[in-house]
């Protein structure tokens, strides 16, 4: 039977929002994030990273660098609280009008948020029920992705979340819940939704 998942954006949700991360050591967890992910692990949720990462398309760094950043993220989560991301999905693509310059990644794709490609692929790969799943992010595109995929959408106020709420970043979105940070989002998830 398909199970639900918690999909997590990366920058501004799990790690500090510092723009494009060129050095591995600049990827730093937001305080309390590892414990929040561990709580989801312990409660039986499938935890999956779902993140737009256009650095390779913009020619800022290689796809291998993105993989190294995700390896560091997993190491920090494990070292801090024994937390685990069960799967990692990301979109390195960006269309040319949006700034994509590297031919291999400069195009439109169903994987780039708010399109549903990453979540549909994860659902297929891991037998997930999107209608009972949650997308947690700090941008309007995360909430739009949740709507497009039929998931619950939680906007965290870390990263760009406050600017989304003010209407000064992207467009107004209507999340199912607004949380101060990932720990508060996980509290809401564990109180209102069941992982099975």
Swiss-Prot record:
The record marks 112 as: Contributes to substrate recognition. The gene is gmhB. This is D-glycero-D-manno-heptose-1,7-bisphosphate 7-phosphatase. It comes from Thermosynechococcus vestitus (strain NIES-2133 / IAM M-273 / BP-1). Its cofactor is Mg(2+); Zn(2+). GO terms for cellular component: cytoplasm. It is found in: Cytoplasm. Its main location: cytoplasm. It holds the Pfam family Hydrolase_like.
């Amino acid at each position: 039977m398909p199970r639900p998942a918690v999909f997590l954006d990366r920058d501004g949700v799990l790690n500090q929002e510092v723009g494009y991360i060129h050095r591995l050591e600049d990827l730093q967890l937001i305080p309390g994030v590892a414990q929040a992910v561990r709580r989801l692990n312990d409660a039986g949720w499938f935890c999956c990273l779902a993140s737009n990462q256009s650095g390779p398309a913009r020619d800022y760094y290689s796809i291998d660098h993105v993989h190294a950043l995700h390896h560091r993220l997993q190491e920090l989560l494990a070292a801090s609280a024994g937390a685990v991301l069960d799967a990692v999905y990301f979109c390195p693509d960006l269309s040319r009008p949006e700034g994509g310059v590297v031919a291999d990644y400069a195009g439109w794709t169903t994987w780039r948020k708010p399109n549903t490609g990453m979540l549909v692929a994860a659902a297929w790969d891991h037998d997930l029920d999107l209608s009972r799943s949650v997308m947690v992010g700090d941008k309007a595109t995360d909430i739009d992705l949740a709507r497009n995929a039929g998931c619950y959408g939680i906007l965290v106020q870390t990263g760009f979340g406050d600017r989304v709420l003010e209407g000064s970043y992207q467009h107004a979105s209507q999340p199912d819940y607004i949380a101060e940070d990932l720990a508060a989002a996980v509290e809401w998830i564990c109180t209102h939704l069941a992982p099975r």
